[in-house]
Amino acid sequence: MIQHLNTPNFSDDLMSESLNPFEVAVKQLDEAAKLAKLDKGMRDMLASPNRVLTVAVPTRMDNGEIKVYTGFRSQHNSARGPYKGGIRYHPQVSIDEVKALSMWMTWKCAI
């Protein structure tokens, strides 16, 4: 299975996508689900995070101005242990990136 995921066609197909991290993670899941012969219900369950939180963080700057920052937290799946990953502090972070990180941490910690 791992050998198949390292083939040029698999990574080339992903690189030709718009590089939305969550879409890449779901495509990786789809490929692994085919190889593992997962049923559609299990694949669908693993394709979505259990919980996604979006927060607004108002912050008073040194000059008195108030800026509102958006934060994201994704909890993908805790079936094989506690939730991990899914947090990133960066001005350009997207909710799709955080969801992908939480999905990848699920795979990493489950194996």
Where on the chain are the PLM-derived regions?
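N-terminal ligand-binding/catalytic initiation module
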Residues: 2-4, 8-111
